[in-house]
Amino acid sequence: MALGFRGDVADYYHRYRRGYPPEVFDALVEVFALTPDDVAVDLGCGTGQVTVPLADRVRAVVGVDPEPDMLARGRRAAAERGAVNVSWVVGTDADVPALRAALGDGAVGVVTIGQALHWMRHDDLFREVSSLVRPGGGVAVLTNGTPLWLQDSDWSRALRESLEQWLGTPAGGTCGTDEESQERYRRSLAGAGFQVAVHGVDYTDTLDVESVVGGVLSALPVDRLPSDRLAFTERIGRALEPHGPFTEHVHVTVLTGQR
């Protein structure tokens, strides 16, 4: 199931989607007692924001994504970092049974899902994953802050207004970061037999117009990208200019389900 995150969108995603703080990976190691003998699976891996740094902590990581272009950028990121223990597989959450057949039941220390669970059938996924992970292992659902256009700041409100004028529709789409979605995921994990916990990491980031625009474009399907990128950037820049600096207070949620 390709989602339209190919071509230029994959480039924007690779360049402008920030990675996760080291404390996130420290938490995964602690919660799931990960060792250099473990295998991890990163579902909906995109261009490797979780996959590549996680490779430093385990024996091998399998990055799974429906878009070959995203995987190609992830492979490039792994090569640049010297991570030779990552495999990149075209697939979706529906392919977890095939992963179980290939890797074996109880073969995986952790299955990570970084800001991608809203694309998946989470109830079915958690039930399938429960047999894939070893005792003490489990699932980690990660969010890396609220979407740029939905934050509680003057610059974010100006961005949202400009996007809504351009799109002609409300700029919604919480990407599973809202409390209602998180509560739904917690219940689903518990229903699949996992021991549920929530961890948080906070940090502050300062953006410029280029990174704001790049972040927005990384979230659009390729057929919705503006035809005139320069004009789009100038439009967003004019909307944001009175509201600088563009400071973002990021709350990373690490929702874990331990078997």
Predicted regions mapped to residue ranges:
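Class I SAM-dependent methyltransferase SAM/SAH-binding core
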Residues: V39, T47-V96
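Conserved catalytic/acceptor-binding region of the Class I
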Residues: S130-Y203
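Conserved Class I S-adenosyl-L-methionine
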Residues: E183-R259
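A short acidic, Gly/Pro-enriched loop at the edge of an enzyme's catalytic core
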Residues: A98-V110
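Short catalytic micro-motifs in class I SAM-dependent methyltransferases
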Residues: Q115
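Conserved beta-strand/loop positions that form the S-adenosyl-L-methionine
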Residues: L43
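Conserved class I S-adenosyl-L-methionine
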Residues: M1-T35
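A short, conserved alpha-helix within the catalytic core of class I
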Residues: M120-V129
